[in-house]
């Protein structure tokens, strides 16, 4: 339905709301081919990209060779063991690892690594997928009549572990889907002060005519206005497909 455009714009504006001023050092952990890394580099940040998938890092390196604003580095690395000195970054982005790491201990390891590499007062922006995303997506796209898809959704709602035994790529890969409050707790458990918990898209991502609305500037602004108005409302945060939590490493 094209709602990734809403996700990307809202993620960027939420990052900038909490980001230090450039030319601060930013680690984009799980940064894939650099969708957010290159954007931040263009804004003047010193960005180091890390991803566990060599193919994606290769794409980022090739892009970096011709980028007008280059990344400091592009490296293959595991979010749970970053090849970075302690207290070396002003901001860490974890915009994928927390839903790709299904085991809670692995997620805590990734968050602990982010805490270690951040300087005191440094910012973390971590993304999650809502526990309810597959149910709402299935409802919007009329997929819940499919028994196999409905079974996947039932499991998602029980324990948050999204398992896709089918060959349908639209059903996403194995992942962990957070309740909003659990994402907050995971950051707090490793020592972060949580400064904001946001629903990224609001309700608009579920609209069947999303692309038509987004392509109309006036209707697009309405989608954004509603997403911003509801972003911190606890009763509806989980209706967004994606969650974003902002935390800060204490200075004391």
Q: What are the functions of these language-model segments?
A:
Residues 5-22:
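Conserved alpha-helix/loop element of class I SAM-dependent methyltransferases that forms part
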Residues 23-30, 123-156:
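Conserved class I S-adenosyl-L-methionine
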Residues 27, 35-81:
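Class I SAM-dependent methyltransferase SAM/SAH-binding core
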Residues 80-92:
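A short acidic, Gly/Pro-enriched loop at the edge of an enzyme's catalytic core
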Residues 101, 167-181:
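Acceptor-substrate binding/catalytic loop of class I
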Residues 186, 190-252:
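C-terminal lobe and adjacent flexible extensions of AdoMet/dcAdoMet transferase-like proteins
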Residues 108-120:
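A short glycine-rich, Lys/Arg-flanked "PGG" loop and its adjoining helix->strand segment in the class I
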């Amino acid at each position: 339905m094209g709602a990734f455009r809403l996700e990307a714009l809202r993620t960027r504006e939420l990052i900038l709301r909490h980001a230090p001023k450039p030319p601060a050092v930013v680690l984009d952990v799980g940064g894939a081919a650099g969708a957010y890394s290159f954007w931040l580099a263009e804004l003047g940040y010193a960005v180091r990209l890390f991803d566990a998938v060599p193919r994606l890092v290769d794409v980022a390196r090739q892009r970096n060779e011709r980028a007008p604003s280059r990344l400091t580095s592009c490296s293959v690395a595991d979010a749970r063991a970053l090849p970075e000195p302690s207290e070396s970054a002003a901001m860490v982005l974890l915009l994928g690892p927390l839903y790709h790491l299904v085991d809670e201990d692995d997620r805590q390891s990734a968050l602990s690594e982010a805490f270690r590499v951040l300087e005191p007062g440094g910012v973390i922006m971590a993304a999650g997928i809502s526990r309810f995303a597959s149910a709402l997506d299935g409802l919007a796209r009329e997929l819940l009549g499919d028994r196999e898809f409905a079974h996947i959704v039932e499991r998602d709602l029980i324990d948050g572990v999204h398992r896709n035994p089918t060959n349908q790529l639209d059903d996403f890969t194995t992942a962990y889907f957070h309740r909003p409050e659990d994402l907050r707790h995971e950051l707090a458990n490793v020592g972060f002060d949580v400064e904001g918990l946001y629903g990224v898209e609001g309700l608009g991502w579920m609209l069947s005519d999303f692309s038509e609305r987004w392509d109309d500037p006036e209707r697009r602004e309405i989608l954004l206005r509603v997403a911003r108005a509801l972003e911190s409302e606890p009763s509806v945060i989980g209706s967004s497909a994606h969650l974003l939590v902002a935390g800060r490493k204490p200075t004391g």
